[in-house]
Amino acid sequence: MRFLSFRRLLLYHVLCLTLTEVSAHTVELNEMFGQIQSPGYPDSYPSDSEVTWNITVPEGFRVQLYFMHFNLESSYLCEYDYVKVETEDQVLATFCGRETTDTEQTPGQEVVLSPGSFMSVTFRSDFSNEERFTGFDAHYMAVDVDECKEREDEELSCDHYCHNYIGGYYCSCRFGYILHTDNRTCRVECSGNLFTQRTGTITSPDYPNPYPKSSECSYTIDLEEGFMVTLQFEDIFDIEDHPEVPCPYDYIKIKAGSKVWGPFCGEKSPEPISTQSHSIQILFRSDNSGENRGWRLSYRAAGNECPKLQPPVYGKIEPSQAVYSFKDQVLISCDTGYKVLKDNEVMDTFQIECLKDGAWSNKIPTCKIVDCGVPAVLKHGLVTFSTRNNLTTYKSEIRYSCQQPYYKMLHNTTGVYTCSAHGTWTNEVLKRSLPTCLPVCGLPKFSRKHISRIFNGRPAQKGTTPWIAMLSQLNGQPFCGGSLLGSNWVLTAAHCLHHPLDPEEPILHNSHLLSPSDFKIIMGKHWRRRSDEDEQHLHVKHIMLHPLYNPSTFENDLGLVELSESPRLNDFVMPVCLPEHPSTEGTMVIVSGWGKQFLQRLPENLMEIEIPIVNYHTCQEAYTPLGKKVTQDMICAGEKEGGKDACAGDSGGPMVTKDAERDQWYLVGVVSWGEDCGKKDRYGVYSYIYPNKDWIQRVTGVRN
């Protein structure tokens, strides 16, 4: 039973009747819940009083009654004052007495429940009360009847499933059944069953339980034309029969076109049936009696057989079967390192199908060895084959190498690539990516002769400074030097890359910068004016000044020039290395350029001097009296007695030294500024590369 709350649906109704009449009185109650109190409650009730409350609730509900207070005169068998609860033909309970002392006669916590939708409550007091009694306070409510439980064994119960709801119930059926018009019984729905698979199983409803009565079932097997269906009944076969008349009640019948098998019934299953058709109808009928288990059959479809297949050379066929028939499909694939070739098209697999006429949908393809094709061209590198006839097929090997001695392979990988089964050249480390050839830096082919004591510099030997770049106006007039970094960057002085500023207001604006089309870069240059067969003229793509460059003090006097195209590296063109560690005082460095070199005239060819690096504080002290500032991003070099220095026209040029351990030349500084070229105690001031190395590498991506 479920208790119901209708407070949200109905206004609370309280019946409190105070009757003074001696004669009987009847009250009709039709609400879903309410309150009943003795006359005069909570005062004492009158003598010789009788009140009856008739409580009626809707069908599908019962009346539930309980007492909150009970105080009546006590008597044997409740002969004097009492409360009687009854239905039409049955007394449900009789109560009297005090709930504090007469626990056996009072209702206490007892709940009275009517069997139906009606309950009558009668209060009766006799002619006298020796004491004061306050009567009773009772409440009633309608509660739902669970018809599913109470009708479980009745004839009107549901066939399959019963569902209770507030005030009623309804029936439903198992899957495959439909509810009868009586809303109680279930009948089977077994018509229109369609089977389209090549194999399957069909049974009577509820098999192996007894099949439903009054059934008209139909099953259709409908396959593609070209299949022929065979039926096989299982051993358990039980359809109601008659000893004299064949299959008068229940039976199963098979139809295929104009052919008919059956009807079948009894306990002996039919023999296998070869229908020779792709469309079959199975009809099953039962009457309204009997408890037979039914039947079960399996069906299988077969088609015309196709010729046996032979796999291609270096290939296989899946699945491998002794016989292939209509609709069977096979997948042709090749061994590792081979691909399927069909009609000049290369593919991983190829599928064919057995047709209804017994022929295959296509011919068997061939298996062709994987060819990785001509290897990609490596920039600044070359490729060699492992075979004489330059094979590029599966498992063939090639080796990439860089153009030596001007380029080297990044990470020192082997450069060996193998043709993979996927048709790609693959390296163990780099996979499908090509290696990278980096320019070799600081290793010129030509070595210098001893020049440490050459006064006022000397002509440089051609090829000993292959990293030097000439910044030239379009008319061929040089105006600064630079150093090649990597394959397409030139490092120079920032002051070389902008027009002169107003001395009174030396503020650099974008409008002061040179345009990339204003000048060009010449590599491999030896003679200042005369053309050289080894020189290369390169266009400028982009220029960038150091973000902290100060044109007034020459702090961070560095600029980068990006080239539109990379120069060809050779004996006369090679980048210089970036420093790995700071430079120390006394280290001998070489400065190169096409400046005046104290001759008060420009030289015909490239000049160079060898000078020592000067102590930072010594250089500061030399320039402080002149009001010049030497900062931490600068480095000084020169002889105390003078005579060797970079002069006008050398700006931006390289100051280099040789790393004895690595036998490579690296860039120490860039010619920046000075005072009184080559005079005593007047050292050359250069932009120091080491503290600016991070900025250079971040912009250019150059690594040694």
UniProtKB/Swiss-Prot annotation:
GO annotation, cellular component aspect: extracellular space
Region annotation (Interaction with MBL1) ranges: 25-305
Active-site residue list: 495, 557, 651
Residue numbers spanned by region Homodimerization: 25-189
Gene (name only): Masp1
Primary location recorded for the protein, binned into one broad class: secreted
Protein name as it appears in the record: Mannan-binding lectin serine protease 1
Region (Interaction with FCN2): 25-283
Signal peptide: 1-24
Site (Cleavage) location in chain: 453-454
Tissue expression remark: Protein of the plasma which is primarily expressed by liver.
Cellular compartments annotated: Secreted
Cysteine-cysteine disulfides: 78-96, 148-162, 158-171, 173-186, 190-217, 247-265, 306-354, 334-367, 372-419, 402-437, 441-577, 480-496, 619-636, 647-677
Species lineage: Eukaryota, Metazoa, Chordata, Craniata, Vertebrata
Enzyme Commission (EC) number: 3.4.21.-
Record-annotated CUB domain positions: 25-143, 190-302
Positions annotated to bind Ca(2+) 1: 73, 81, 126, 128
Protein's UniProt keywords contain Disulfide bond: yes
Function description: Functions in the lectin pathway of complement, which performs a key role in innate immunity by recognizing pathogens through patterns of sugar moieties and neutralizing them. The lectin pathway is triggered upon binding of mannan-binding lectin (MBL) and ficolins to sugar moieties which leads to activation of the associated proteases MASP1 and MASP2. Functions as an endopeptidase and may activate MASP2 or C2 or directly activate C3 the key component of complement reaction. Isoform 2 may have an inhibitory effect on the activation of the lectin pathway of complement or may cleave IGFBP5.
A single MF term (Gene Ontology): calcium ion binding
Subunit-structure text: Homodimer. Interacts with the oligomeric lectins MBL2, FCN2 and FCN3; triggers the lectin pathway of complement through activation of C3. Interacts with SERPING1. Interacts with COLEC11; probably triggers the lectin pathway of complement.
The Sushi domain, residue ranges: 304-369, 370-439
